[in-house]
Amino acid sequence: MAKHTLVAVGGSGQSAAIAFLRLATLSGMPPEELPNIYVIDADVKDRQGADAKPSLYSSLKVLFTQLVQGVPETNKPRLELIFPYSHQQSHEVM
């Protein structure tokens, strides 16, 4: 069966992806059936300091990691952060 894909663009897309993962959890969706999630955002930054609020991407990453814990690598869905501009070449893959 083909793996589904969820593309989360910007902060609103990340909020929607978090809501989807919560709904999938509440509805009992097996973690192997979660879609691959691609986050496209030019503004994602690592926040520093004690007063820094967690970013949406950080929250999404934590939730996703918890949900797919224990899933074999061959069946594990992907979470990938993509920067849309050529000067931001690096991206993160989980």
Residue map of PLM features:
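Segments that form or flank anion-binding pockets
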Residues: 1-94
